UniProtKB/Swiss-Prot annotation:
It comes from Escherichia coli (strain SMS-3-5 / SECEC). Keywords: Chaperone, Fimbrium biogenesis, Signal. Induction: Negatively regulated by H-NS. Positively regulated by IHF and EcpR. Belongs to the EcpB/EcpE family. SUPFAM superfamilies: PapD-like. The keyword Ion transport does not apply. It comes from the Bacteria. The keyword Signal applies. This is Probable fimbrial chaperone EcpB. Residues 1-20 form the signal peptide. InterPro entries: EcpB_C, Ig-like_fold, PapD-like_sf. Part of the ecpRABCDE operon, which encodes the E.coli common pilus (ECP). ECP is found in both commensal and pathogenic strains and plays a dual role in early-stage biofilm development and host cell recognition.
Amino acid sequence: MKKHLLPLALLLSGISPAQALDVGDISSFMNSDSSTLSKTIKNSTDSGRLINIRLERLSSPLDDGQVISMDKPDELLLTPASLLLPAQASEVIRFFYKGPADEKERYYRIVWFDQALSDAQRDNANRSAVATASARIGTILVVAPRQANYHFQYANGSLTNTGNATLRILAYGPCLKAANGKECKENYYLMPGKSRRFTRVDTADNKGRVALWQGDKFIPVK
């Protein structure tokens, strides 16, 4: 997959193989008509967990994205930022965007630090045990421009995002290659200024369908 395209899982970094904390979708979107977002997290283990959450602004949600400064200290807020989560319990984390209302799309990494509560309460003599029982999970939050301009071009099986907000694009229908079966489906996130050609679905076939989401609005393309 080309580097400039966003697959359905935008980014996942530093995750422990034995993940105890369920943070839901790896990528979340705050649409242009909303300034709040809620994510439900769940402790799927039989022991309490200490959860700490940190926010970082990114230049890009792709692998080469760099941490950059926020335009203002309270650009993106969350609550709670730290909590004790009992075994098999859930909690709703709320995010509030208070940044510029301009035409720029913004990207943030939500860093979840997950630690077994029993380990977190140990003294410094047992710090090595804490490290092995801890996890750092990275998910992505995309804040659509407050002044979103949704535009696209489609030709010969290729979609180009000519607007300023990320699109969710999809194709479904007959498979391009018989080895893939009869029916195929593709889903991607397409950033502003990028193009995507579908490689599994035969979009040239009369039964091939292409569509996209502009925020919460479904748009048939073909």
